[in-house]
Amino acid sequence: MSKKLTKKQIEQLSQFTVDELLGVIHDLSEKYGEINQYLAMNYLMSPEEKLKNIENEYKRQFRKKGNYEYWKSHAFFLDLENKTVRSLDSLALGLPLETVKITEKMIGEADDLFEKYDTSSGSWQDYLYGLLNVWIKALGAAYKKDNQVDFVGHYLEVKSNCDYYFPSDLLQNNKAFVPREVIQKI
């Protein structure tokens, strides 16, 4: 069985009525639980509901016992990145202040998380660097939306809290989201 729909199959789907498509979606969601989550997260929730869902998922993952087995730890960080960081990335421009708040909390708790898991695979770095990129994107959007946001203060605080892990090229890689005057101040 192929993983992608062929052109012919897509053409057949385009000929379905709205009711037939709703029936297909309903059947799929009854048989496969992941489809329910995907539909809800990507199409049926407001941005505020998505943010709350992401925050709850992060709390659930953070409370897990921890594991020092290589592959389980590797899978944990990949899963955490997929379920939280990528979802936050889609909200960073729409809800910047809220995204900054939750990402700063997650960055602040990163060391506690790293102590509970084997970090030799390096997937923790993908998680953290993805999180830092979402944070800087949201912080830049919050600054552009409201110049009263203390971009430099937030930046220096997070940098000092995770200086060991902080990538030196973070601002350079996210120039599109960071105002020029802020880069000059830093």
At which residue positions do the language-model features occur?
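Eukaryote-biased, non-catalytic alpha-solenoid scaffold regions
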Residues: 1-11, 30, 34-186
